[in-house]
Amino acid sequence: MRLLFMATLGQTLHEVTLGLDLAAQLKDAGIDAHFVVDRYNKGQLDAAGHPYTLVDTSMGPGVREVVAGAVRRARPDAIVLSDYMAHWLTHVVNYRTDPWFVDDFGPPVIPIDSVNLENTGLELELLGRPTLVSDRILTAPAHLLPVPANRPDATGGRGLPYRAARTPAPPSEAARKELRRSLGVRDGERLLMLPTLPWQRIMQTQAGPLTRELAVRVPRLVGRYLRRLPSHTRFLAVGPYLEGFGLPEDRLRVEESYTAERYASLLGASDAVLALFLPSFALERAVLADVPGLFTVNTFDVDGEPGLRLLSDAFGGVSPAVRSWLAAFPGPVPPFHMWPLRWNAVVSRLLEANPLTTTALRAELLDEESVVAGLEAVLYDPGVRDRLAGARADYRDAITGLPETVEVFLTAARRCGVTV
C-alpha cells in the first residue's frame, strides 16, 4: 500500500511528526509513504528518509497543482491528512483555497484528528472571530485519534484511537548528563523547558487586537512567575524566546531552531516542562519521555472589578502582580486554553475525563501562587514528582493496551474505502 501524507502547516513540528510517527509504525507492514510538507519541515523529511514534495504559502491556490504532481508521482492508495484541523486551517487561511481539493485526485482520504472534533465540537477562534471548522469530519467513515493527546478509551464515534508513537528509549544517564552539561546545567540544578512556537511570536505583531495583546502581555506575567523560582533553576527556551519573559541571562539557554531529534533530546534532558498552551506537543511527548510538567489555562472572563472579585473568591486572593497586569490590559481578559488563541470549546472538552491531565499539574494562569508553587513542585518535590511519574506510567500502560497501530490503520482504511 502507498500513502500520501498531507502535512502542509508550517512553523511547527507537530503535524509532520504525527505523520512520520504513523508512517514509521506502518513501514514494517510494507506500507510506503510520500509526504507533502512545508519547506520549514524539510529537515524532518531528510532525516526520516521518506520521499517528499515541498510547498510554501507563497504558492497560494497554486498549491493544488503541486500536490497533483505529488499524487501522480506517488500513486497513493489513500491520502492521509496529518492532521484534519491543521489541513483545513492552513489551506483556508494561508493558501486561500478549498481544502477539499484533495478529493479531486480519487484516492480515499483518511484524516488524523488530534483533538477528536467529533466529540469536542467544531468552534474555534480564527483571525479574531468565532469560526466553525469544516464539518466533513462528522461524516468521514473513519478517522484516526492519536494517543496522546486523545483519550485511549475514546468511543462513541467514528474515531479510532491509536498509539501516536512508539515509546522512545530513554537516553543513557551518561548521555543525559553530558547534554545537561553542554546546556550549562550544574549538579544540583534543575532545568525547566519552556516551549514556544514561531507563530506565537508572529502574533505579537500580526493578529487581531485581543490576540495580539495576549501574545505580548502573557510572557510578561509568566516571566514574573519564573523569576520567583529558586536561584538554582535554569531555563531552556525551546523555540522563539519571547521578549516579555525577561529571564536572567546567566540561567537561560535558548534553542530557537532545532531538529525533531534535538527537540526530543532537550525534552529528555529537562527536569520539567511548562506548557502555556494546549494541545502541547511538549506535554504529550513528556509522557513518553517520562518528564513531569505543568500546564496553564485561563478559565475566567475578567472584566473590571467584578472579574477581580471572581478571581479572588476562586483563588483566595489576587496577587499584586496579577492585579497590576490586569489593570494594564486594554479591556477584558477572555478565557483561553491555546494561548494566545482561545479555542476554549475544543480544548476544554478534549481535557474532560482525559487521563493525560493526570500526568501533569494544572494551574490557572492568573493564580500566581498556584503556578509558582506548582512549578516548584514538579521541579523539586519528590512526592509530587513520584505521583506524576505513576500517572505517566499508567497512561503509557493504557497506550500499550491499544491494538497494534497497523491493525487500527487498516481498519480505518477499509472503512474509508481502501482495498486492503
Task: Name what the model sees in each region.
Residues 367-380, 398-420:
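C-terminal alpha-helical cap of glycosyltransferases
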Residues 63-66, 238-289, 293-294, 299:
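Donor nucleotide-activated moiety binding/catalytic core segment of transferases
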